[in-house]
Amino acid sequence: MNSQSGTRNYGPDKARDFAQQLVKEANASLESNRKMWLPPQNQTPVLPIYYQYVIATSTGYEADQGVYCHHNDEHYFFVSRGRNKNNYNRSVIRKYAVGSDSILNIFIMPHHPDSIQSSNYDVTSAGIALGASVKLSGIYETGKKPWQFKGLLNHEIGHVLGLRHTWSGNDGCEDTPNHPNCWNREKTAPCDTAASNNLMDYNANQHAWTPCQVGKIQMNMANLHSLSRKLLEENWCRLDESKTIEIQDSVVWNGSKDLQGHLVIAPGAVLRVRCRLSFPIGASLIVKAGGHLILDRARLHNACGDHWNGIMVESKGRHEGQITFRGDCSVEDTIW
């Protein structure tokens, strides 16, 4: 967002370069989850984070390459504090959001020029998540590099994906302890030992996701009715045989999954499914001779409005695959 004069934010070329680099830096953080600092001497596992951002184009706006520059003196500014703050004002979103039913919109907005001139107003970076949109400020005025805002972007998108602040109250995760919300580690107490590096705190690092936070994000993405899911690229609709999963041990699946390949239960293996599973068109669930599939209040279907092959039970000599149904189960959208 920029003023009508075009002097309050980056021009088109610089804006596009900045946005692309910011997304690249934020994705790099997603690829390199770090160990939690809190609690001290913790044994919290460091899990991979299985999502990345893609700058999306919308039909009719392909030439903009997913980065749009708007000039509007009424809507371009962000006031993060004071009696005239407009953090929760959605007017800019209502006017300029593109494809908000399936695209996460990031609005980079400068502070109001009157705010900047006030000696009591700190020109700092700030952000807020509002539904499927995020408003960020302090990007242009501070003159910082894109990598310096990757934590801010990941933090606000974390809210969109269902995460809450962790330093006080209950965020729904036992592995994110409360703390005094230090900005960084210091030599004096309490910030010598109580500083956090978690994504959802206000701190100088914001590069650690806990197992619970990763799980909450994945759970929301797998929820057929969630906001998070509407923002995903549907890469589970086409069969990719390289993504075939073979179960070779005793495994229980409790959380919904959208598979991209076949599912094979090897001889001697047991898979207990207690959730929703989606299979792409052309995919099969193969129970090898000696394998055992337990459907425990499970739903097997195709989440793309199409069909999948269904369940194949193989036999070999005196051995054959087994299927056990427990509770209310459904196998839908099969061609067999």
Predicted region positions:
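Sec-exported extracytoplasmic/periplasmic mature domains
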Residues: K24-K35, H159-T166, A222, S226
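Pan-zinc metallopeptidase signature
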Residues: C212-S242
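Propeptide-to-catalytic entry region of secreted or membrane-anchored zinc metalloproteases
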Residues: M1-A97
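Extracellular beta-helix/beta-solenoid repeat scaffolds
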Residues: Q248-W336
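Solvent-exposed, polar/charged alpha-helical surfaces in well-ordered, non-transmembrane soluble domains
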Residues: D17-K24, A28, G151, N198, ...
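The catalytic-center signature of Zn2+-dependent metalloproteases
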Residues: V134, G138-P211
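Active-site-proximal segment of zinc-dependent metalloprotease catalytic domains
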Residues: R81-S168
